[in-house]
């Protein structure tokens, strides 16, 4: 067996690369034709039903507006019902056929069943399920002394997407519908100070990749990954994907290149309606895939030099509307080093990337 593996290790990689190099144009042509066809004849969302979790602000809010422009019927789900009322009114003015708001916590399976059942009872169908809830953090893992929020991070970033999908799938099968997931570039490009978030997003992406195979073509899956997004990053502020405005503080400045939440939401909805398997924004992040595969040491050096250099104080946090989660303590590290979670609201939590 060792001999067989040695032979395969020697011949399979170069043979695969040569085959891919020659077959790449042939593979791209049908994909381009399919993309053009779906752009022209993609899903017409007029009157169709879309459930959006984490809809009270940020990406979830902007996605609601994009579907409203397409005259869809919306079900807006979040914990902050008072925020949903204003967004629902805006969506109606923008063209939504009808808007239902539901206060629910998507990390609880019974509440997911409740809002899906309410959707079916009222509309009789579900065409798209858009999961946007997330919770980001910034801390060095080895400095954490209070681990009580670890399960919360994983519940929100993983189970907060899985439970709604599980409950909605039987109804999505009936309409040949689609599940849209708000993932992140950290799922394949993990960054320092975001260890648990990156792990949860990687698990999420791999879950939906597997689910895509299981569902075949009966229910579509669109995985949207984004890098830094925001509207005020040049002034040191950025809009978290679920809407809480935060201030990035660090003992040295960090320059960030990103894009507006509105643009990501527009691309995400357009890609879902075309039936795209993936939506990436900004697309230039793809270059890091090459480094990840062929030169991983370059990324390691870059992170050490640019993000977490030796000799720099590890004092970084999000400040703004942050508070404890459900009365639970925030993550703390030995003074003066404090690692804070971005604010949690199950209209979604705050998330950085």
UniProtKB/Swiss-Prot annotation:
UniProt comment concerning the protein's domains: The proline-knob motif may be involved in the targeting to oil bodies.
Record protein name field: 11-beta-hydroxysteroid dehydrogenase B
Record lineage: Eukaryota, Viridiplantae, Streptophyta, Embryophyta, Tracheophyta
Function: Has dehydrogenase activity against 11 beta-hydroxysteroid and 17 beta-hydroxysteroid. May be involved in signal transduction regulated by various sterols.
Motif Proline-knob positions after renumbering to this chain: 13-26
Superkingdom assignment: Eukaryota
EC number: 1.1.1.146, 1.1.1.-
Pfam families: adh_short (PF00106)
Similarity field: Belongs to the short-chain dehydrogenases/reductases (SDR) family.
Residue positions binding substrate: 184
